[in-house]
UniProtKB/Swiss-Prot annotation:
It holds the Pfam family PSMD12-CSN4_N. There is a cross-link at residue 92 (Glycyl lysine isopeptide (Lys-Gly) (interchain with G-Cter in SUMO2)). The modification N-acetylalanine is found at residue 2. The gene is Psmd12. It comes from Mus musculus. PROSITE patterns: PCI (PS50250). The modification N6-acetyllysine is found at residue 368. There is a cross-link at residue 92 (Glycyl lysine isopeptide (Lys-Gly) (interchain with G-Cter in SUMO1)). This is 26S proteasome non-ATPase regulatory subunit 12. The keyword Ubl conjugation applies. Belongs to the proteasome subunit p55 family. Residues 242-420 form the PCI domain. GO terms for cellular component: proteasome accessory complex; proteasome regulatory particle. Component of the 19S proteasome regulatory particle complex. The 26S proteasome consists of a 20S core particle (CP) and two 19S regulatory subunits (RP). The regulatory particle is made of a lid composed of 9 subunits including PSMD12, a base containing 6 ATPases and few additional components. Interacts with ERCC6.
Length: 456
């Protein structure tokens, strides 16, 4: 490295002018011996003088050894003030070599892990974060120190401060950091943002992770952590279709597929959330794809429930509750229930949403088989009041799921979509052409018959 040149703090690449390796080899053992005798201040002054010579001569290896030796002696003597002071001093020296500072910071990072005294640890972290601020060549060390600081803050109950500290890091721009470690940092940022209920920032941070990364080897734990965090986020947003997709990703993970209990719970959640999602083309497509999964045979109740929503028949809510209520909310000894319809506020809300999906399914079936129906008859089929039925119908019309027009005075709903004038004209023209062709053919046949009879 020394032969190839070293980089100074101002960005200049310099070549080693004098090799101080022999001098440093001789001086360091002497200094270590003196430091153990309690003459630390004297030793540091000697080493600082030697450091100036090695730095001026651009001897990166020797400078690194001296910087590491200084902080090591301060640490072993437990002179914490002196340690922090020398870290600041050595990193700010004129034309300091970047590689030497990096070596010193890396050495100090090991001390952070070893120190048990919290105030001392926090002060050392603050010093190192100050030294590494804005320096690309020690960005990984700064990121790790920041993560350690955030963990300490969280353990002390200051989750908001922990989230704020960790958000400072833009680790997605750290090219020198391994992809796996980058993802770990981003997941930690997401977790802390969720802990302080900062859902918008969590959504922004989540987009920094490319899900293709989870196709690589040894990423299953990170994949599960990511999708569980995304489920928490989308549960707050009430986006059931997204939650269904997240559970499908968990279900498709090899380590989940390997354990029967885990994949069954994941598949149950997939089924329930796809049913809870409002009807649209994407939801309908996903329902049919999930229905084709052969593993549904092993959880028959959930398979039958999903089939109800793909069959073009009306459902009665009371019958559904009677047949599936206990299984969905409490489970059985063979198939434990999921937390989708738990006894919490969120679970009760999802249960109400399930009833809404049943009603919406029934209205779509009516729109398919009826052209006109009275409000009273529709309310009777839905087991709802007229006002409730009208509210559900209006919602589906607004979302363009179905077409309907309500004649309130007559109390009649018309599901027949009015035809476009151009289409009507085209149909009339086509039918007229067909009629004229038929008349022409008939006239021709009559004339033919007359000619045959005249000949006879």
């Amino acid at each position: 490295m020394a032969d190839g040149g070293s980089e100074r703090a101002d960005g200049r690449i310099v070549k080693m002018e004098v090799d101080y390796s022999a001098t440093v080899d001789q001086r360091l053992p002497e200094c270590e011996k003196l430091a153990k005798e309690g003459r630390l201040q004297e030793v540091i002054e000697t080493l600082l003088s030697l450091e100036k010579q090695t730095r001026t001569a651009s001897d990166m290896v020797s400078t690194s050894r001296i910087l590491v030796a200084v902080v090591k002696m301060c640490y072993e003597a437990k002179e914490w003030d002196l340690l922090n002071e020398n870290i600041m001093l050595l990193s700010k020296r004129r034309s300091q070599l970047k590689q030497a500072v990096a070596k010193m910071v890396q050495q100090c990072c090991t001390y952070v892990e070893e120190i048990t005294d919290l105030p001392v640890k926090l002060r050392l972290i603050d010093t190192l974060r100050m030294v590494t601020e804005g320096k690309i060549y020690v960005e990984i060390e700064r990121a790790r120190l920041t993560k350690t600081l955030a963990t300490i803050k969280e353990q002390n109950g200051d989750v908001k401060e922990a989230a704020s500290i960790l958000q400072e890091l833009q680790v997605e721009t750290y090219g020198s950091m391994e992809k796996k470690e980058r993802v770990e940092f981003i997941l930690e940022q997401m977790r802390l943002c969720l802990a302080v209920k900062d859902y918008i920032r969590t959504q922004i941070i989540s987009k920094k992770i490319n899900t293709k990364f989870f196709q690589e080897e040894n990423t299953e734990n990170l994949k599960l952590k990511y999708y569980n965090l995304m489920i928490q986020l989308d549960q707050h947003e009430g986006s059931y279709l997204s939650i269904c997709k997240h559970y499908r990703a968990i279900y498709d993970t090899p380590c989940i597929q390997a354990e029967s209990d885990k994949w069954q719970q994941a598949l149950k959640s997939v089924v329930l959330y796809v049913i809870l999602a409002p009807f649209d083309n994407e939801q309908s497509d996903l329902v049919h794809r999930i229905s084709s999964d052969k593993k549904l045979e092993e959880i028959p109740k959930y398979k039958d429930l999903l089939k109800l929503f793909t069959t073009m028949e009306l459902m009665r809510w009371s019958t559904l509750v009677e047949d599936y209520g206990v299984e969905l909310r409490k489970g059985s000894s063979e198939t434990p229930a999921t937390d989708v319809f738990s006894s919490t506020e969120e679970g009760e809300k999802r249960w109400k949403d399930l009833k809404s999906r049943v009603v919406e399914h029934n209205i779509r079936i009516m729109a398919k088989y009826y052209t006109r129906i009275t409000m009273k008859r529709m309310a009777q089929l839905l087991d709802l009041s007229v006002d409730e039925s009208e509210a559900f119908l209006s919602n589906l019309v607004v979302n363009k799921t179905i077409f309907a027009k309500v004649d309130r005075l007559a109390g009649v709903i018309n599901f027949q979509r009015p035809k476009d004038p151009n289409n009507l004209l085209n149909d009339w023209s086509q039918k007229l052409n067909s009629l004229m062709s038929l008349v022409n053919k008939t006239t021709h046949l009559i004339a033919k018959e007359e000619m045959i009879h005249n000949l006879q």
